[in-house]
């Protein structure tokens, strides 16, 4: 029982870290096109939806971010961040 609570905390902490990265390095970066920032905001909203299980929230965010990950207008540094976030989200079960 305690182990499950610790695991949930770790998952929630990871989700919070991912949200922070998306906010600070994508949403607030004015060099990133608006449509990409908007998609990052949608992914953040999906991750913050506490009504769903963490794995479902992660899957929702993955779907949103994968859709924009190949956008030709995305700056290279942003693409790298998105790929790192996708890798972190894929580890959430």
UniProtKB/Swiss-Prot annotation:
It comes from the Archaea. It holds the Pfam family UPF0147. InterPro entries: Ta0600-like_sf, UPF0147. NCBIfam families: PRK04330.1. Belongs to the UPF0147 family. This is UPF0147 protein PH1921.2. It comes from Pyrococcus horikoshii (strain ATCC 700860 / DSM 12428 / JCM 9974 / NBRC 100139 / OT-3). The lineage of its organism: Archaea, Methanobacteriati, Methanobacteriota, Thermococci, Thermococcales.
